């Protein structure tokens, strides 16, 4: 494999973009601080309580708040894409040897990698402060389940970045982030919603991300329905992302 192959170019661009993202300390703090603080607050209130289905309330909250922080990190990477489009960097890349598909894959990889601080720190707080007790295998399985379940949100960040402008991408990202988090049951149990809202919640990818993580952390295996729904969202958003990317290239 030479340094000019699409795979090598994708990896190199993803590495450079990830380094730039991790240098943005403000971005990292904002995507980690709120979910971590909320988890610590609620974990102290509900310590020792049982959520049912082999799950403690603290473990339930740990998955919810980790998902909350990770979704925010993934979606908000769209802001950098919008900035790159405004300054002309995106257009320069289109004229380079980097294929469009490699660019999109690299950006999706970056979106996935910037979610790791929120995931790791909330899980670490769960183990140390929250008293969540899992085997090494359970920690690994739960972490991987939540992380891989974030793929549609990484793609959603790309969609927002290519469809929005520098002026609109931040409010769009925030509304989408909070809307998916609340409606998906990351802040409040979906069971507490009115019946019609419960049905709407089950259409959101955030609901199934939380369901995936909670089912795995409870030791009940991987829920097939959650995987299928998240995969479906990934395919739909991927198609929209490709369309938005191509459309953004036609604008001066």
Task: For the regions a language model picked out, list residue spans one by one.
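Membrane-interfacial helix-loop-helix junctions in multi-pass membrane proteins
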Residues: 51-52, 132-133, 184-237, 251
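Short, membrane-interfacial amphipathic segments enriched in basic
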Residues: 1-14, 196-206
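Short amphipathic alpha-helical coupling elements at transmembrane boundaries
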Residues: 12, 16-20, 91-95, 161, ...
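Helix-loop-helix units of permease transmembrane domains in multi-pass membrane transporters
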Residues: 80-112
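Transmembrane helix-boundary elements of multi-pass transport/secretion proteins
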Residues: 2-9, 15-87, 115, 119, ...
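Alpha-helical transmembrane segments and their short interhelical loops
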Residues: 100-175, 221-231, 236-239
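Transmembrane helix-loop junction
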Residues: 43-48, 127, 131, 158-162, ...
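Transmembrane helix segments
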Residues: 41-46, 163-203
């Amino acid at each position: 494999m030479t340094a000019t192959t699409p795979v090598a170019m994708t990896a190199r661009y993803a590495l450079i973009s990830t380094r730039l993202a991790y240098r943005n300390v403000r971005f990292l703090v904002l995507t980690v601080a709120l979910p971590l603080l909320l988890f610590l607050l609620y974990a102290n209130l509900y310590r020792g309580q049982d959520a049912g289905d082999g799950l403690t309330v603290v473990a339930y909250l740990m998955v919810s708040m980790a998902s909350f922080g990770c979704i925010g990190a993934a979606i908000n990477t769209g802001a950098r894409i919008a900035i790159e489009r405004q300054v002309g960097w995106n257009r320069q890349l289109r004229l380079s040897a980097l294929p469009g598909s490699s660019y999109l894959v690299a950006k999706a990889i970056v979106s996935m990698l910037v979610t790791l601080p929120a995931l790791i720190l909330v899980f670490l707080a769960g183990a140390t402060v929250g008293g969540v007790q899992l085997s090494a295998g359970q920690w690994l399985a739960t972490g991987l389940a939540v992380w891989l379940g974030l793929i549609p949100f990484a793609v959603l960040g790309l969609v927002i970045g290519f469809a929005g402008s520098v002026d609109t991408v931040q409010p769009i990202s925030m509304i989408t982030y909070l809307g998916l988090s609340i409606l998906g049951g990351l802040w409040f149990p979906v069971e507490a919603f009115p019946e019609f809202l419960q049905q709407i919640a089950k259409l959101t990818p955030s609901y199934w991300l939380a369901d995936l993580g909670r089912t795995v952390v409870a030791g009940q295996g991987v829920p097939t329905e959650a995987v299928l729904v998240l995969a479906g969202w990934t395919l739909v958003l991927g198609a929209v992302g490709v369309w938005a990317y191509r459309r953004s290239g036609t604008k001066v």
